[in-house]
Amino acid sequence: MSSQQQKQPCTPPPQLQQQQVKQPCQPPPQEPCIPKTKEPCHPKVPEPCHPKVPEPCQPKVPEPCHPKVPEPCPSIVTPAPAQQKTKQK
């Protein structure tokens, strides 16, 4: 009986030791991987976003908006009174 008891406690210690060695090996490679992806992501997003948005948005919006609004306005107002004159005749 004593021989069986000695075998049981002997088998679990080696298994636990193997698992402990594998666990610390896995986290180190994962840790350096996370910061690497964050570093290139942050600088790439703000750099192209800021210069691209204000440059094309500001010049394109005010230029085509101002000339388009006054042009169609007078053309629509002129036919309105013209039609009224023909009806009065």
From Swiss-Prot:
One of its GO terms (molecular function) is structural molecule activity. Pfam families: Cornifin (PF02389). The gene is SPRR1B. This is Cornifin-B. It comes from the Eukaryota. Induction: By carcinogenic agents and by UV light. During squamous differentiation of epidermal keratinocytes. One of its GO terms (biological process) is epidermis development. Residues 1-29 are annotated as: Disordered. One of its GO terms (cellular component) is cornified envelope. The lineage of its organism: Eukaryota, Metazoa, Chordata, Craniata, Vertebrata.
